[in-house]
């Protein structure tokens, strides 16, 4: 893992050298020379780390100490850089020349110590004949495979067809005992893939449905809340008495629920008190997956069990072939030599029939040349015992990653098992960690480079795609529990991060912690009460119900912390006092608060001049101070709510940004900023803004957005919430890059073809008054794929989606979503040529009883 620390040091030294050059010019040129020397030496050391690791794996025990020395050196250099940069910046701010000189002298002395250690390491390296492999292209841009996964069948069940047919018949059998099907087997066999395919196929035959990930550390209250939301329990009833109201609703509904990855029977004992038995006359069904047959037997009886087995050799090779070649490639092995085919079969044999091992191996091989030599090297690395195949393959696939991608992959282990992780979060945390840097001459943004890395991880089958965005990009993802365990094990071994369970013990080890994640309230509280020394902590993740994390933080400075993520339970609201010591976290770059958290960010946050991302979840009421605008590095300011909650967050006049304090060049996201605290003329300065959401849009803002030449030329996503009818006509036709538009208007709003961007892909209309004239405009949009109408008022009871006189009617529309319509009783389409690509019609919300024409019935949920 030394290579990860070395990469971090290299990236940080590039940043510091650039800052010194800009800020100090020739005054501290010799410091820049030291930084450049650090960068060169760390690159050199990194170039032979892989060779050293190979020698260690080959049995050369002497190399182990060398790798440990390299890791400690890289860690100390990272500490030095993280400590040095804020001091220089602070002294520059107040023009403390003597203090700055003192810092520089101190830094130079530390560099001399490091130089002596580098000489010793290089001497030992030569003694052990460790060579420079020069195989660490950390700057590679992963574009070739960027879109390979986009059109893949996410429910591929090669080799499981018989299992699928048997389970489908069992689920639809009226005499199914207990109404439960239990899919059991060892990790990696495809239990979840098979269960989700079944669930999605049969759920339309039930009145309501729910899919829940249970995982190793479940919380019954959160599982029940998740089920309640999916089956349509009202928010009021969830707040009043979740358990009783959920049970009452399920008793009268025919439901199907998938509980994925149940580890033990204790959680079922809690859930069954609320979930009614499935063997009633109603005919409800329960699908569970578990690696433990006894769990399935306990829940559904012996007859419920369906044990998955490893794939037979031919089915294994069929899956391997499907993943190696493009999905539309009919030639397959036609152009391959017989020897390459045999090597491929041997590789598949080492995977032991485990689908996860097979697809991960195929993902790794897709990144290599399709030659006998390249594949033989993989085969030789897999060992000779079939039973070791899966573990070997997973570790080998990790080592096959580009060095710059390895810490990005390990980051998935910071989240709990089965957690759905937003791509936005991952990308911006990687950037905050300096895992992703933009080199000189590269015109692409860091976010684009990070997205390439995420695409590559999905393409290699190391990460599972969960959701896509409106334009086919990754919205969220998950990691398989076996790969999650690999992340945790590798991270612990290398001190990359620790989970709370292994953080206790030797105070010396605790003091070395660089990243820590808490999944449990009790463990978190016990840990902080032990008064640990956390001077080196960079990343803190807390997934908890107890809001005391904020009070515990008051006792620590966290001077090197640059990523803070607090995810609170949704089941209750927490009023917190965020300590003023937040202002001491001078290295903080990424802040995310999620859950029902009420409080105020302290004014001391203005000292956090390196903040890049502030992300406040839509359920949180967190007030930002006015000084948040002063961060020169701010890229994303997100408040994910456009209702009263967001208004409350900004109920301070001092939030109004000073046009001269704003640093607009880096800003890419401003989401749900109240118009009254945002001066429209600032829009001209936001030249790199990609996403904008404004609450309470004024006429002056509409006018500014509607001028002939677009003021926001890079804008891709625009969300506007109007509190009253705008007198100005909105015109967005001059914005070619806007692909996603959200308009929230409580009254009638005049719209025509000039009101919309020409390349719109997703459109949401909320609280609109919809008539046939607006509908006629929408039908002509040439690229619109998804249309959502949220609590709209319809002036006519019947909505006809058929083509107009010109023949147009949603030529590219794939999804139409109508939520809680007011005044609409019928949706029809009378011709066969309209909406030729429509795949799904969603009717959701209360009182959504709409009659549909025959064609639309087939597409509705």
Swiss-Prot record:
Source taxon at top rank: Eukaryota
**Residues of the NB-ARC domain:** 162-388
Gene Ontology CC annotations of this record: plasma membrane
The annotated topology with respect to the bilayer is: Peripheral membrane protein
Q: Which residues form a coiled coil?
A: 63-83
> Impact of altering residue 767 to N?
Impaired ToMV-B7 viral mouvement protein-dependent induced cell death
Instruction: Give me any GO biological process, just one.
Output: defense response to virus
Impact upon substituting residue 286 to I: ToMV-B7 viral mouvement protein-dependent induced cell death
Provide the site residues for: Contributes to the specific recognition of ToMV-B7 viral mouvement protein and subsequent resistance to ToMV-B7.
Answer: 767
What InterPro entries has UniProt attached to this entry? Answer: AAA+_ATPase, Apaf_helical, Disease_R_plants, LRR_dom_sf, LRR_R13L4/SHOC2-like, NB-ARC, P-loop_NTPase, RX-like_CC
- Broad class of where this protein is predominantly found: membrane
Q: Residues that bind ATP, according to the entry?
A: 185-192
MF terms in GO: ADP binding; ATP binding; ATP hydrolysis activity
Q: Which UniProt keywords apply?
A: ATP-binding, Cell membrane, Coiled coil, Host-virus interaction, Hypersensitive response, Leucine-rich repeat, Membrane, Nucleotide-binding, Plant defense, Repeat
Whom does it interact with, and what assembly results?
(Microbial infection) Interacts with tobamoviruses mouvement protein (e.g. tobacco mosaic virus (TMV) MP, AC P03583) at the plasma membrane; this interaction triggers defense responses leading to programmed cell death.
Q: Which PANTHER family match?
A: DISEASE RESISTANCE PROTEIN RP, TOMV SUSCEPTIBLE PROTEIN TM-2
**Record's miscellaneous remark:** The Tm-2, Tm-2(2) and Tm-2nv alleles present in the tomato mosaic virus (ToMV/TMV)-resistant tomato cv. Craigella isolates GCR236 (AC Q71BH0), cv. Craigella GCR267 (AC Q71BG9) and cv. Yukang 2 (AC Q5MLE9), respectively confers resistance to ToMV but not the tm-2 allele present in the ToMV-susceptible tomato cv. Craigella isolate GCR26 (AC Q71BH1).
* Job of this protein: Inhibitor of viral mouvements which confers resistance to some tobamoviruses including tomato mosaic virus (ToMV) (e.g. strains L, B7 and ToMV1-2) and tobacco mosaic virus (TMV), but not to resistance-breaking isolates (e.g. LIIA and ToMV2(2)) ToMV and tomato brown rugose fruit virus (ToBRFV). Elicits a hypersensitive reaction in response to avirulent (Avr) movement proteins from resistance inducing tobamoviruses (e.g. ToMV and TMV) strains, thus leading to programmed cell death; this local extreme resistance requires rbcS.
User: What protein family does this chain belong to?
Assistant: Belongs to the disease resistance NB-LRR family.
Name used for this protein in its record: ToMV resistance protein Tm-2(2)
Gene name of the record: Tm-2(2)
């Amino acid at each position: 893992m030394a290579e990860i620390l070395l990469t971090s040091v290299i990236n940080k030294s590039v940043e510091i050298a650039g800052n010194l050059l800009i800020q100090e010019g020739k005054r501290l040129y010799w410091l820049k020379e030291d930084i450049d020397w650090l960068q060169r030496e760390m690159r050199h050391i990194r170039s032979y780390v892989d060779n050293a690791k190979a020698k260690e794996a080959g049995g050369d025990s002497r190399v182990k100490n060398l790798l440990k020395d390299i890791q400690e050196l890289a860690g100390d250099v990272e500490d030095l850089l993280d400590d040095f940069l804020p001091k220089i910046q602070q002294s520059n701010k107040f023009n403390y020349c003597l203090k700055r000189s003192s810092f520089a002298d101190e830094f130079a002395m530390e560099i001399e110590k490091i130089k002596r250690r580098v000489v010793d390491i290089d001497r030992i390296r030569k003694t052990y004949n460790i060579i420079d492999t020069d195989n660490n292209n950390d700057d590679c841009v992963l574009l070739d495979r960027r879109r390979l996964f986009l059109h893949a069948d996410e429910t591929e069940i090669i080799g499981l067809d018989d299992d699928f047919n048997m389970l489908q018949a069992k689920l639809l059998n009226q005499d199914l005992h207990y109404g439960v099907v239990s899919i059991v087997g060892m990790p990696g066999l495809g239990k979840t893939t098979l269960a989700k395919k079944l669930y999605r196929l049969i759920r339309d035959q039930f009145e309501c449905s729910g899919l829940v990930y249970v995982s190793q550390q479940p919380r019954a209250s959160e599982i029940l809340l998740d089920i309640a939301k999916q089956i349509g329990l009202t928010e009021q009833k969830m707040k009043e008495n979740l358990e009783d109201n959920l049970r009452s609703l399920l008793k009268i509904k025919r439901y199907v629920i998938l509980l994925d990855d149940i580890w033990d029977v204790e959680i079922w004992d809690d859930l069954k008190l609320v979930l009614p038995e499935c063997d009633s006359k109603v005919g409800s069904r329960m699908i569970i997956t578990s690696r433990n047959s006894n769990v399935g037997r306990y829940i559904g009886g012996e007859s419920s069990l369906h044990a998955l087995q490893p794939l037979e050799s031919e089915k294994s090779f069929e899956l391997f072939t499907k993943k190696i070649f493009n999905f539309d490639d009919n030639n397959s092995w036609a152009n391959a030599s017989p020897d390459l085919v045999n090597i491929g079969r041997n590789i598949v044999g080492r995977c032991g029939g485990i689908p996860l091992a097979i697809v991960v191996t195929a993902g790794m091989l897709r990144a290599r040349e399709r030659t006998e030599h390249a594949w033989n090297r993989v085969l030789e690395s897999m060992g000779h015992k079939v039973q070791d195949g899966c573990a070997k393959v997973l570790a080998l696939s990790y080592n096959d990653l580009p060095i710059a991608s390895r810490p990005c992959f390990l980051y998935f282990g910071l989240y709990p098992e089965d957690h759905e992780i937003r791509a936005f979060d991952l990308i911006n945390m990687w950037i905050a960690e300096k895992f992703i840097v933009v080199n000189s001459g590269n015109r692409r943004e860091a976010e684009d480079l990070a997205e390439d890395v995420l695409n590559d991880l999905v393409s290699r089958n190391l990460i599972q795609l969960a959701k896509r965005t409106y334009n086919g990009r990754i919205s969220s993802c998950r990691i398989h529990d076996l790969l999650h365990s690999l992340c945790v094990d590798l991270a612990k071994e290398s001190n990359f991060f620790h989970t709370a369970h292994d953080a206790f013990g030797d105070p010396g080890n605790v003091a070395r912690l660089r990243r820590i994640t808490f999944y449990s309230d009790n463990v978190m509280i016990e840990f902080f009460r032990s008064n640990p020394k956390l001077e080196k902590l960079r990343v803190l993740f807390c997934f908890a119900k107890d809001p005391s994390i904020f009070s515990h933080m008051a006792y620590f400075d966290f001077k090197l912390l640059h990523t803070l993520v607090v995810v609170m339970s949704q089941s209750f609201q927490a009023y917190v006092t965020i300590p003023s010591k937040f202002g001491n976290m001078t290295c903080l770059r990424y802040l995310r608060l999620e859950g029902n958290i009420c409080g105020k960010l302290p004014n001391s946050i203005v000292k956090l001049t390196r903040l890049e991302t502030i992300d406040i979840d839509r359920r949180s009421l967190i007030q930002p101070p006015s000084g948040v605008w002063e961060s020169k590095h701010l890229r994303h300011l997100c408040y994910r709510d456009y209702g009263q909650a967001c208004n409350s967050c900004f109920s301070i006049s001092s939030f109004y940004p000073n046009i001269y304090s704003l640093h607009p060049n880096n800003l890419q996201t401003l989401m749900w900023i109240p118009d009254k605290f945002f001066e429209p003329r600032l829009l001209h300065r936001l030249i790199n803004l990609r996403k904008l959401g404004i609450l309470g849009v004024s006429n002056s803002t509409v006018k500014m957005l509607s001028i002939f030449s677009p003021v926001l030329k890079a804008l891709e996503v625009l969300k506007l919430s109007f509190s009253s009818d705008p007198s100005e006509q909105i015109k967005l036709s001059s914005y070619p890059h806007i692909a996603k538009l959200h308009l929230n208007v409580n009254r009638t709003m005049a719209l025509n073809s000039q009101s919309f961007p020409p390349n719109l892909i997703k459109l949401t209309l909320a609280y609109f008054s919809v008539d046939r004239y607006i509908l006629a405009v929408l039908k002509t949009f040439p690229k619109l794929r998804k249309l959502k109408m949220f609590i709209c008022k319809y002036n006519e009871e019947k909505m006809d989606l058929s083509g107009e006189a010109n023949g147009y009617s949603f030529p590219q529309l794939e999804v139409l979503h109508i939520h809680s319509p007011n005044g609409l009783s019928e949706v029809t389409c009378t011709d066969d040529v309209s909406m030729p690509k429509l795949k799904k019609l969603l009717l959701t919300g209360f009182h959504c009883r709409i009659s549909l024409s025959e064609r639309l019935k087939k597409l509705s949920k």
